[in-house]
Amino acid sequence: IDELDPARLQAAIVEQPAPQARAAQLCVASSLHALKALSEEIADRTKAIKFALTGSVGKTGTKDMLYQMLTAFGPTHATKGNYNNHIGTPLTLTQMPVDTQFLVCELGMSHAGEIADLSAIVKPTIAAITCIADSHIGHFDCLQQIADAKAELFSNFTAGGTAILPRDDAFFAHLKTAAKTAGASRIVSFGMHPESSFRLTEAQ
């Protein structure tokens, strides 16, 4: 941070002080833990409607579509690229403008427990799962374990949250139960299934 312009940098979170730095420094034991704590505080304070989404495929495309749609209704902030891990998610929150009305966070995982940790940071108002597939099966023994890990998304729902689920997925009932158990007040589904809340009937 010695070379950073103090006019653009008001303070830096550091683990080791830089004696020649011209900007203020906040010395902490773990910069990663400090980043997480800061992002959690921002998530708690914001009045934005918070969307969190995960799934085996389609996360980034769905996030980008949501961003485009929500921007028409108010200031919207979303995960950049696929910065969807334990560093990218806190950064998404710390970079969120104060006037944001809609926050869209893409959450990724490679191990069980990761989605729960990220969900605890965001505390989503609306949580969506695109689908359950074997895209990340390298660290899991079966699709059921992947479904369980993705369902961690609901573990930190804002009270009365909404869950959006893939109706055609073999694990729909499992995900629905997980969402209801977590306190979802509304379940919305999508897909080709005739009982889907929303389904594509015609395309051009």
Feature roles, as predicted:
Residues 14, 27-28, 52, 78, ...:
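Structural signal for conserved beta-strand scaffold positions within catalytic alpha/beta enzyme cores
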Residues 12-20, 167-170, 192-193:
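Short, polar loop motifs at secondary-structure junctions
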Residues 1-37:
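N-terminal leader/targeting and accessory segments in enzymes
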Residues 22-28, 92-95, 204:
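Short low-complexity, flexible loop/linker segments enriched in glycine and/or proline
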Residues 21-24, 182-186:
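A short helix-to-beta-strand connector/capping loop
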Residues 143-147, 177, 184-204:
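Adenine nucleotide phosphate-binding catalytic loops in nucleotide-utilizing enzymes
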Residues 33-167, 173-184:
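Phosphate-binding loop of NTP-binding sites
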